[in-house]
Amino acid sequence: MAMDFIRIRGARTHNLKNIDLDLPRDKLIVITGLSGSGKSSLAFDTIYAEGQRRYVESLSAYARQFLSVMEKPDLDHIEGLSPAISIEQKSTSHNPRSTVGTITEIYDYLRLLYARVGQPRCPDHGFPLEAQTVSQMVDHMLTLDPEQRYMLLAPVIRDRKGEHAQVFEQLRAQGFVRVRVDGELYEIDAVPPLALRQKHTIEAVIDRFRPREDIKQRLAESFETALKLGEGMVAVQSLDDATAAPHLFSSKYSCPVCDYSLPELEPRLFSFNAPVGACPSCDGLGVAEFFDPDRVVVHPELSLSAGAVRGWDRRNAYYFQLIASLAKHYKFDVDAVWNTLPAKVRQAVLFGSGDEVISFTYFTDAGGRTTRKHRFEGILPNLERRYRETESPAVREELTKYVSQQPCPACNGTRLNRAARNVFVADRPLPELVVLPVNEALNFFRGLSLPGWRGEIASKIVKEIGERLGFLVDVGLDYLTLERKADTLSGGEAQRIRLASQIGAGLVGVMYVLDEPSIGLHQRDNERLLGTLTRLRDLGNTVIVVEHDEDAIRLADHVLDIGPGAGVHGGEICAQGTLQDILESPRSLTGQYLSGKRRIEIPKQRHKPNPKMMLHLRGATGNNLKNVDLEIPAGLLTCITGVSGSGKSTLINDTLFTLAANEINGASHTVAPHREVENLDLFDKVVDIDQSPIGRTPRSNPATYTGMFTPLRELFAQVPESRARGYSPGRFSFNVRGGRCEACQGDGMIKVEMHFLPDVYVPCDVCHGKRYNRETLEIRYKGFNISDVLQMTVEDALRLFEPVPSIARKLETLVDVGLSYIKLGQSATTLSGGEAQRVKLSKELSRRDTGRTLYILDEPTTGLHFHDIEALLGVLHKLRDEGNTVVVIEHNLDVIKTADWIVDLGPEGGHRGGTILVSGTPEDVAAHKASYTGQFLAKMLPSVKARETRPAAMANKPDARPPRKVKPEKVAKATKTATKKTAKKKAS
């Protein structure tokens, strides 16, 4: 009998509290609850892990050793599982060769299509490389004007130097009467002597004729003779019209003009990962690295002597003496601002003097001077040479700061070699197709109709390509291009690509486990995504989704609410069943938010911007941005909204953040193209909080990441017993020798490799999982040793360390961002995406604040429940109220409706986006008819506009200054002033 339920008994993975539940099979199940309540522990670490483990164990022991087998979950019993496929938020491959096309396998089908029905052309002359039969050649000639006279030519010599007397002898011996030499017709006995050192082309005249039906046989014989003599190449030239282009024929797969040929087309010719297809200059990467003048001249507003080019100023005697000699030769002042120097001088300094010899004065070790004349190498060639010749990783890393990337000049960034770039299907080469947005590519293939045998072969391949492109459109990724690099995709995009690939596989009877597929998706596209999930279910699969999105919860066949709290306070089932069951459950927080008993309130009054304190970014043109001018009010909470692919990340992460980090923090990021920026001096610090993991090793934990572990170790080193023994703070680190347990090297666990079974981690039998040796554990603070402290939750630790300000401040900020339940020593690899981002946020909050920080957050609501979002908004509003500027890229309407200012990009994704539709308050955006964000926002805002009374907190600060163009010296001065003022306040 077929099982109708997945039965789980006694699940205790991570924080799950011995739960029993029955989940219906072949249904869409949504698991929801607070961040850290145990959703992923149930969905991924229990259900998926056991489903995958059982399937893998059905394979042979030999096969199992090549597969990663997940750890066996801690539970009593589970039944009714199917083979499991997980689609997680993890970003895709960081391999620069991985693209949207290769991940979805669409590119593999495109390679097959071009190899089987592609028509190669000569890269130089554009002629199709087609092998024609004699019959086809004759038939073509018979279509020409029968009144015109033509001659049939066989090319014997092509562009070769020499007198070629022996060639004429051979032709005469074979009975040929006329030849054409370099375009001139001669009797064979009257050919003038040819110049020895010039290139010549010699063609034998095989026949002269008028194309009529009655000479068909003669023409065929003439063509056969010509092909034999011309090694498969024939030309037919009009005798009556010398200016007419010749008709060229080839019996082999080659260009009739230059004899360029290709071997038989194979799919690997179109692979940029195979040597036969990759561009030889960039090895198929599509980019070339070069030393960028804009990165080398760090401060163009300074002079060469003051440090316009780092390392070539007065502080470096050797390089500066070269500059001084150059200045003498070209008659320029080393103290003149770089931007004011003549173009010729700047060219010579950066790229060298070319053939011009310059007299250089060098200081000798003895203190004397010596003069030598030679060419000047140039700063950029100097860097290139040092980069090429050095064997020191440190030097190479230092020089990498000056390197930028540009599209490979040989292949124009297409990654393929000449041959592959010149194969056409319906007059389009492969590189032209992969740069099309997915929806345009889909339209192309839907309209593709090839004649004859090509059409028959192409139909099956095109069907597969069309289906896969259609699935990408269904999950809201119609704006992506197939050549987009995988490492530039957001977590949500990467997950939806994998989802599209799974639908393309069309499996039945499988259990899919998904982690928040709605991340990064605008409300407009949500419906299509949910349709995709229901289609997966309707195929006959069980779809388990960890999700916070209201629409997804309402659509589910079965909802599971885990809680009531997070961490140690969660791990229980608060409610399960249909949507109605959840709404009626008094224990379900989710139900209370869905029913409207609880909700995130709209602020009663919005902060209004101060027109004198606006950050201006003008002329942004990165990726799909269309000369965008961005205004962000300082001291407010600004939301950047827009459909997926509209240009939000390019504008904020790639342009604004990189620019601000370079100017204010002294970073060296590559900035997306823009024209100018004004008023960056309103800020003294810029902080970017993204969703990347806080650590990729089990040794990284919240205590080490937030910097709390250092004062903790210092505190333990100050305990009287510790001082008596002479212990330093390093004694309490599990990363270095001294205080850690050397049997497990401070891991607390020992890994036992089991080959074809999952690796087993057992507690170290020396320290019993405590990570430290016995002597270190004897040191106690208020009865707790360092291992006990690492096992504490944040809230317990706060009670213990309240009297220690340096530790308490960091613990308080972890509580503020809703992470009171995590353990101080919890491995960073076990934190969810939302938790990792909030640990980062707490780290920034715990730093001393000047009230002039620019915070940039990319979808901070990822992995957060309605209740968590309310707490997060409290933190963001607190930052704003202290005068800081908070810029958030967000799709969540609860965050958007509480913002002071919104910048909405659109109208669509990809090349149909990239413009700012509307900027203003949420009410302004809701009133804008063209804005998709506005349409959804209007449903959440009351009809009466919120009163705009309170000015921005930052506007009243004494630091406020009128707008002006940013200069690095002024940024430094502003920072210094702010620091002094803060110090004065503290003193008073």
Curated annotation (Swiss-Prot):
GO molecular function, one term: zinc ion binding
Zinc-finger ranges (C4-type): 255-282, 741-767
Record-linked InterPro entries: ABC_transporter-like_ATP-bd, ABC_transporter-like_CS, P-loop_NTPase, UvrA, UvrA_DNA-bd, UvrA_inter
Origin superkingdom: Bacteria
Residues that hold ATP according to the record: 33-40, 642-649
Keywords of the record: ATP-binding, Cytoplasm, DNA damage, DNA excision, DNA repair, DNA-binding, Excision nuclease, Metal-binding, Nucleotide-binding, Repeat, SOS response, Zinc, Zinc-finger
Start and end residues of each stretch annotated as Disordered: 948-988
Start-end of Basic residues biased regions: 978-988
Domain (ABC transporter): residue spans on this chain: 312-589, 609-938
Swiss-Prot/TrEMBL GO biological process terms: nucleotide-excision repair; SOS response
A single GO cellular-component term on record: cytoplasm
Subcellular location: Cytoplasm
Similarity annotation: Belongs to the ABC transporter superfamily. UvrA family.
Subunit structure: Forms a heterotetramer with UvrB during the search for lesions.
HAMAP family: UvrA
Annotated protein name in UniProt: UvrABC system protein A
